[in-house]
């Protein structure tokens, strides 16, 4: 009876961790979309809400870490049970960093002064954001469902995000060289594109955490990367 009670208590602890991660993930997804939307529409109020929303992300991460450590101390789990708890902490850490990146984009809204808004660049940024947001949702669904094939599909998809980011950098550099008045807007857009690309990297981290949680080992294959977003590599003609 004692063993059964302990098992039920552990399952309850684990379910609560999973619920908290899902709640955190939902907030992060919204932050990504809102931060880019605020930037594109020059919506200062929305940008401020994104910045303010990061505090809740941080709070949830702290709760997840505290509950995870307490569960390990009380239940002394082993093997897959221990990996489940460690994975919850790792996913929460990546989500917190994604929240920081979205917050950074939200802060940039107030700095935009130019009315320069080339439609091609805006569409590229929106497409990149849609792709990354979809990957975040997919990898969190894979984490909750213990769906390894779905997690690996996200892991393999990071290269597409990198390719879009590199293309955007080249376009932005071209606009800056054509007219110095475009520089301020383009620089902010560059940082935002890079932040979205980094969000993709954190999403890939979560996919690797799912692999570790299920398989009990790290992925040995080299992570697919197509990022060439340095100023030198992104110059037209390179």
What is each stretch, according to the model?
Residues 1-238:
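Cytosolic, long alpha-helical scaffolding segments
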């Amino acid at each position: 009876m004692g063993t059964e009670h302990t098992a039920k208590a552990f399952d309850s602890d684990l379910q609560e961790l999973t619920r908290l991660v899902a709640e955190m993930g939902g907030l992060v997804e919204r932050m990504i979309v809102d931060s880019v939307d605020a930037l594109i529409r020059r919506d200062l109020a929305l940008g401020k809400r994104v910045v303010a929303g990061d505090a809740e992300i941080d709070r949830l991460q702290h709760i997840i870490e505290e509950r995870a450590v307490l569960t390990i101390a009380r239940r002394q789990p082993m093997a897959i049970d221990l990996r489940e708890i460690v994975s919850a902490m790792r996913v929460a850490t990546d989500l917190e960093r994604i929240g920081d990146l979205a917050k950074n984009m939200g802060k940039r809204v107030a700095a935009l002064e130019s009315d320069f808004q080339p439609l091609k660049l805006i569409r590229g940024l929106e497409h990149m954001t849609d792709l990354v947001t979809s990957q975040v949702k997919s990898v969190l669904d894979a984490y909750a469902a213990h769906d390894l094939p779905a997690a690996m599909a996200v892991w393999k998809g990071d290269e597409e995000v990198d390719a879009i980011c590199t293309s955007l950098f080249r376009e932005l550099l071209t606009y800056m060289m054509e007219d110095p008045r475009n520089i301020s807007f383009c620089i902010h857009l560059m940082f935002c594109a890079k932040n979205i690309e980094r969000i993709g990297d954190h999403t890939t981290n979560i996919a690797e955490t799912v692999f570790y949680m299920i398989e009990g080992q790290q992925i040995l294959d080299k992570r697919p990367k197509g990022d060439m977003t340095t100023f030198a590599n992104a110059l037209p003609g390179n």
